[in-house]
Amino acid sequence: MGPYLSQPKRDKTTTTGQGKSVIFAASEMQGWRNTMEDAHIHRPDIIQDVSVFGVFDGHGGREVAQFVEKHFVDELLKNKNFKEQKFEEALKETFLKMDELLLTPEGQKELNQYKATDTDESYAGCTANVALIYKNTLYVANAGDSRSVLCRNNTNHDMSVDHKPDNPEEKSRIERAGGFVSDGRVNGNLNLSRALGDLEYKRDNKLRSNEQLIIALPDVKKTELTPQDKFILMGCDGVFETLNHQELLKQVNSTIGQAQVTEELLKKAAEDLLDQLLAPDTSQGTGCDNMTTILVYLRR
């Protein structure tokens, strides 16, 4: 059996909500893929003045993405730096904490409960792209190739950069760890250089966590929000395959326009976007992945 269905699953699961400073819609669609391996979080006002959103694109199974979806916010709230409003460090530490939890006996047991097939959980992992909004500051922590794009003055202000093995800095680390990059893949296998999980690539006891073949340490980008900032578009890589960032923002803006933004309007914008991105067939390979997007409208 190949990676694709004979017909796509177009049904969408969409959640909407709002907080003091945001309105959001999170929508996911399995599409042409045999299984759904994406997960996401949406937590407006987890504490006063803080909202958190995240997308997790699984590979090698759905289990790590589901694990992170369940545990990320709880671990972030427990984090000492989070409590001291040191959000950049808190995000980094929470990404690394996910790997720590996955390595525990309890974590391994939970992964097995999530598994859809009898696969080796050591090769399961997920990307993580998490946006934290604190008052007028936006932080985006990223490991992998999911993305966040801020619509600023109706143009794209990119809040993350993909972590690919061919990137010179990433490639140097991989080679220092004893690995190689072939066809854009770590050891010829994984097409990401940073991810949560993927524990088989993180087993060299002589190396620190940020020196392994694959690392969970995210980049964190920070920006001060202005009245010109309209919304954040978050998504797994399947959302970004066929249209560039400016085209994606234009598509969302064509739905919400200058109207009073509501949960229902954002729901329509998110679902319409996924419909447009879905390929009519699998011949080209793009528009065929699982798709998850979160639209976070900023109340200014």
From Swiss-Prot:
Keywords: Hydrolase, Magnesium, Manganese, Membrane, Metal-binding, Protein phosphatase
Sequence similarity: Belongs to the PP2C family.
PTM comment, free text: The N-terminus is blocked.
Annotated protein name in UniProt: Protein phosphatase 2C 1
Protein's membrane topology: Peripheral membrane protein
UniProt: Mn(2+) 1 binding residues: 57-58
SUPFAM superfamilies hit by this protein: PP2C-like (SSF81606)
Cellular component, GO annotation: membrane
Entry EC number(s): 3.1.3.16
Subcellular location: Membrane
Enzyme category, top tier: hydrolase
